Amino acid sequence: MKKGVICIETEWQITTQQNKRSINTEPLMNFLQKLDDVPCIYRRVATRDELKYYLKKFHNKEFENYKIFYFSFHGDTHEIALEGEKENLSLMELGDMADGLFEGKFVHFSSCRTLLGSDENLKDFVEETRAKLVSGYTRSVDTFYSAIHDIALINELLTSTQIKPLLERMYKLYGGLEKKLGFKTSDELHV
């Protein structure tokens, strides 16, 4: 069975006025499904409880071939923002919620600045979750450019078996874009 993608995205309705384009990542998942028959699951969450519900559900055996977790949220240093919560969710809290779900999987944060800051926090997240690779951005990102990079990255993650050559190909093809977005991976930390 093919590797699949689980996309979890926050609700944007509270900031719709600021998000004039009212963009979400569901069309990216539809594109992957139509392009190469990639199994994709798309879910929207606004609260910790909703996120926790889906993370628990994805522990079921039927989801074991979904090797990529794609999180689309607002973000800040080592955090993601759930639209229905006052406080951001730290990566460590997310790791606790996941309860082993990310082990051996690829985890990508398509959110502003989530991987900004101390490498120790990212190392701790990788060690706790045992994720195969964690990636994301260190800068405030433009939706258009991050969507281009995200779809290219997910395609590489779906088709590649080795991380180093995958990341080298990505840099060769999209190095300028990666610099613009502040793309960062746990592979750089040799975790």
Report the location of each language-model feature.
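Active-site-proximal C-terminal subdomain of hydrolase catalytic domains
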Residues: 114-191
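A short, glycine/acidic-enriched catalytic loop
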Residues: 74-104
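A domain-level signal for caspase-like cysteine endopeptidase catalytic cores
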Residues: 1-66, 103-110
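Short acidic, S/G/P-rich loop/turn micro-motifs used as interaction or catalytic elements
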Residues: 12-17, 48-50, 75-79, 113-117, ...
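Leucine-rich repeat
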Residues: 59, 95-100, 125-126
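Short, well-structured hydrophobic secondary-structure segments
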Residues: 62-76
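Short His-Asn-centered micro-motif
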Residues: 45, 71-72, 83, 107-113, ...
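Well-ordered, non-membrane alpha-helical segments in soluble/globular domains
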Residues: 21-28, 54-56, 84-96, 118-122
